[in-house]
Each structure stands twice: as C-alpha cells, then as structure tokens.
Swiss-Prot record:
BP terms from Gene Ontology: proteolysis
Domain MPN: 99-222
Entry-linked Gene3D superfamilies: Cytidine Deaminase, domain 2
Family classification: Belongs to the UPF0758 family.
Alphabetically ordered keywords of this record: Hydrolase, Metal-binding, Metalloprotease, Protease, Zinc
UniProt-recorded name of the protein: UPF0758 protein HSM_0009
Span of the annotated motif JAMM motif: 171-184
Length: 222
C-alpha cells in the first residue's frame, strides 16, 4: 500500500481504490459518518469494534446491547439491520437470476447470512430445476437449540410439487460448531436415497456454524 493510500480518508480511499481496500475500522467509520464529542469518527469506530470484538459481533448484536454503546443509537441500529437484510436479498437474487449454480461460494454465503445467527436449529432446502436454477427456498423444519426433526418424505413431497430436479440441503448448528453428527450423516443419506428413487439429485448438504461451515459435497460424502 502506498503512503498516499494510507493518508486518504475512508470515503476518498473507497472512491479511489474500491471498498475492498478499506479495513474494518474504515468501513465502519463510513457507516457511522460522524464521531461524538471529543471522539473523532475513526476513534469511535475503533472503540466500537473493540467493544463488539468484530464487525460480525456488531452486526449480530441485539438492539439493547447495540444501543448501550456510546455513539450508537436506534438510527444506526435500524440502518445496519437494513444493510444486512439487503445483503441477504442480494445474495438470494444472485441465486435466483443465475443461469445455474456454478458458484458454491455464493450458495454458502447466502446460507450463512440466513442461518448463521439463528438461535434455533433450522433445516432449509433449496429446490432447483434440471438446469440447477433456483425454483424456491423453504425453511422446512424448525427445531430447538440443538435439534430439528427432519422428515425426508416432506422434502420429497415439496420437491415433486414444484417439479424440482435437484436439492441443496442446509441446516445450522446454534452451538457454533459445524461438524456433522452421526445423526446428520444418517439423515442426509436417507434423504439422498429417497430422492434418488424419484430421480432427484441431492447436490450438497451445508451445515452452518458460527463463522464456519461444513459441506458434504466438498468432503466427498455426496
């Protein structure tokens, strides 16, 4: 990075070099816009990140915790929630308008934004057509903090109803650890076998943890 680059203010640096050139503190400073009394915006940004440990911690904070931080309030909370939701919808639209699912990373990022911070286990299915384009996504089963009862026949029933040719399975582990259990492996195999009887392919099963994930396809388990 050049000396000129390091002396630019965040807004000017973004305009000249792009958003990816900014670090977390600089990005947050643009979002905050102004500092508070005796605390310039860059210093406030640094304090906020230290308080929440990371951007992820800030984004995941509930309203009460968020607004307890000096310099933050309901306006910033609402704006941040709106930005987060727009990101989710952008990723979903990327999947919806893609000609086919050629980017597993886009699928993973979307599933992470949807499932990573849920406090209950949710089992989601992406239903795809024969060219692997998204038909619909559906939260099929909602469970407790550590378990969701999954009924493979209900998944197949929905797949047949929307004429899906392929499926991507996903669920979260609220514990934060994405390592699959034996029950996860058995359930995935049951869905795969039942799907094959109906000539429907299971392309992958993602398990989403806190800042980590597990892909059955990447491990060669599907």
């Amino acid at each position: 990075m050049t000396q000129q680059n390091t002396t630019l203010m965040p807004r000017e640096k973004l305009l000249k070099y792009g958003a990816s050139s900014l670090d977390d503190k600089e990005l947050l400073a643009i979002f905050l816009r102004t500092g508070i009394k005796n605390c310039p915006v860059m210093q406030l940004s640094e304090l906020v990140l230290a308080h929440f440990s990371s951007l992820r911690g800030l984004i995941n904070a509930d309203q009460k915790h968020f607004c307890q931080m000096k310099g933050l309030g309901i306006t910033q909370f609402v704006q941040l929630q709106a930005c987060t939701e727009m990101t989710k919808r952008y990723l979903l639209q990327e999947l919806q308008f893609a000609q086919e699912f050629t980017s597993p990373d886009t699928v993973r990022m979307y599933l992470q934004t949807e499932l990573e911070n849920k406090d209950r286990e949710i089992f989601m299915v992406l239903f795809l057509d024969n060219q692997h384009r998204l038909i619909k996504k559906e939260e099929m089963f909602l469970g407790t903090i550590n378990q969701a009862n999954v009924y493979p026949r209900e998944i197949i029933k929905t797949a047949l109803f929307c004429n899906a040719a392929a499926l991507i399975l996903a669920h979260n582990h609220p514990s934060g650890v994405s390592t699959p259990s034996m029950a996860d492996r058995k359930m995935t195999e049951n869905i795969k076998q039942l799907s094959e009887l109906m000539e429907i392919r299971v392309l992958d099963h993602f398990i989403i943890g806190k800042g980590n994930y597990f892909s059955f396809a990447e491990q060669g388990w599907i």
